[in-house]
């Protein structure tokens, strides 16, 4: 069975089962070869796919020498380190944040009202006051907070907000414009989720990876 036949069968399944799918598309190389929308085609919140864009940008920053996987969180923000900080806090690296093994071992900053600052008006101060429960690097725990901290490390290293850095390194290269991006209470784009994109634009990053890092 070819890709188009599989796509058509999937569309039929979505329709027959009334599955909560807004849109679906497949691409071959740089071209979309099949696309179907079940709601109006518009930019939508891509939620945790945002993490893929931020981690890609961090990879670019590492290649450019702005960061290292061994860069320590506390070195990026020494002013946020509590006077009674745990030894383990100083062991958290960018590598741990990207692999969600920071050691906080809790799904922080994932509550529905986090964008309004409920309970955490300053994400950095909030996370630096959390207890590191296990040794960094020892345990996987899915948490948007790890992504948010990694994003802030990128901002600090690049000297600009995430939106600016990603526009220069990714969005403009993929003809994605300047996407709407939800921010934290202090105006920093949320690295854990919140970019708005159309389906076609959302697909582009996957195409880049499938094409070994090239676009057109």
Question: Which residues does each predicted region cover?
Answer:
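Active-site helix/loop module of the DD-peptidase/beta-lactamase fold
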Residues: 66-104, 129, 157-197
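Active-site-proximal alpha-helical segments within enzyme catalytic domains
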Residues: 149-153, 193-215
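Short, charged, amphipathic alpha-helices and their helix-cap/turn boundaries
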Residues: 31-32, 111-136, 160-179
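Short, positively charged
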Residues: 1-12, 62
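A short, well-structured edge-of-sheet supersecondary motif
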Residues: 7-40, 69
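Catalytic tyrosine of NAD(P)H-dependent dehydrogenase/reductases that use a Tyr as the general acid/base
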Residues: 47, 140-142
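Active-site SXXK
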Residues: 30, 45-70, 97, 150-154, ...
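Flexible glycine/proline-enriched surface loops and loop-helix/loop-strand junctions
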Residues: 39, 132-135, 146-148, 184-190
